[in-house]
Amino acid sequence: VRADFHAVLTQIKTQASSKARLVTTITEDLFTQGGKRLRPLMLLLCARACAYRGDAHIVLATVIEYIHTATLLHDDVVDNSHLRRGKPTAHTRWGNEAAILVGDFLYSRAFQLMTQVGDTRVMQCFADTTNCLAEGEAQQLLNRHNPEISQSLYLDIIRSKTAKLFETAAQLGAILADMPQAIEAGLARYGLHVGTAFQIIDDILDYSDDGASIGKNPLQDLQEGKVTLPLLYLYEQGSPAEKRLIRTTIMTEMPSESQLNAIKTAIQESHAIPYAYNLAEKEIEQAISALDILSDNPCKTAAIHLARFALNRLQ
């Protein structure tokens, strides 16, 4: 799918231009910053693994990346995040208004592009997905500064706000190839499990010394009052003193550096990171098993490698 992938990278840049110069300036900056483009790649691999022979997958892979980027622009404003992939965020450079408007532009351009495919199933899939992403982010916002969040709720949130777009990317590959329902469901499960593992690893990296090396702002989730899996584990399994520290820190709008570092040390000295990594490993095992419904081919093998890459970012 190398040629397909390059076609998507080209289209991502060309279709993001606008007669509004500020929009073009920001989108050009966004799409030359790098990024793994895992979601578009997943869609391409799943379509080809299902023996799809058309070119609508190029358009839909572009749509997936636009939706993903739009959510990042909006999320960074909501979270007041100043770094993404090790560089200043759009709202830090151009202001909240510009970042929000460019996010809106990318959403609308995504829907313009998907109408070119002319498939109501595709439209319905994207409509459901964008709704789910918004609900997941709202759920996370509601539970900010809440130390009592359960693992079940944590998983619900990350499946909605992160894993859903992976699920859609994989599922669309089967829809384009007009696969039977069983194969479509299998690929959707594959995407959902990969996306869940991807977010768990991302949450581990917030407390890892490796986080900064891949462009993450260390302890950003903790500073924003977000309870993710490593912190959740420590809160449930830690000492009374550690629980008090977590409660105080999470419920404080501006925690001190000493509080943040004390929690990071406690997490690194506990079993929290191995516990979270083990859960991510299980998600990847389930993702790979879900691909058993496909006959062996090079794109299926590549999809398995993509799943393992999501896990191995920590290594």
Roles of regions detected by a PLM:
Residues 1-315:
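All-alpha prenyltransferase/terpene-synthase fold signal
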